[in-house]
Amino acid sequence: YKSAGVYAYFAYVKKQLDIIKPDIFWEVNTIIPINLGGSFKTMITIHDMFPIEYVEYFGQVYSMYFKYNLKKTLKNTDMILYNSEQTKSTTEEFFPEAKSIANVNAYIISNPVKKQWDNKDDDYFLYVGNMEKRKGVDLLIKGYLQYKNRGGKKKLILGGKMQEEEINQIVRSAMMLDEDITYLDYVTHDKKHELYASMSAFVFPSKAEGFGMPIIEVMRFKKPIIASNLPIFDEITDGNINTFNIRCNEYEQINNLADELLSYNTEVDTEAYANVVKRYAPDRLGKVVYDFITSD
């Protein structure tokens, strides 16, 4: 994990900082593996603690690398941007020294939907995101097949970059079993919005999530959402979505998801959705970040 590319990048950054001499350097990633020096303030962005919390998805070596280098990074960090209160809380649990560093929860800034789409229901569930186990794609496939076995009629469309061979095999096998499953691979920004506008509901069965931007995107289309009951989803949606329990064994998780697919609430609270979207609007969050950076 001492990638030559990573160290070369930060060596280049250090040279540029020596030339530019900024007041603040904002690193959009979590770890800065070298001491950048200089008289400027350094701000890092912390997305999650997954390499420590979910070693099974990242491996023991990367988990140790992450923990060691973040501890070193924090010694030279003046400000932290978090993406959620959950991430802040978890970070401070693993790294108590982070509590004494100035911080704000505001960095998630998404682009507004500019094109107008005609909302309709073409009778399909949709998942868009990375195709990996951490995102719960395996649960989605198994839950959907059970949903169909129990009389469900809607189709399932999957979109996103394939990240793991195990998930690839699960998806391919499921498509051979059920012709109502479609995998589109990576989808463009416009295609994604087109799919949002025509779906019955968005399904987001993630097992670990630092934020969940797709949920905010879907709320703009006023469509039902079915997600796992991760605490982060309660934080960002104020509990205004359908959820299924994943705090159980896999057999129960699959049953719970199938139950939700069969009986989810098709009505949405449009006012509650609008309030969530407004909270994460670019203008508002941009001002929060600006005020934080310029407050000292």
Where do the language-model regions lie?
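Carbohydrate transferase catalytic cores enriched for Leloir-type hexosyltransferases
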Residues: 1-296
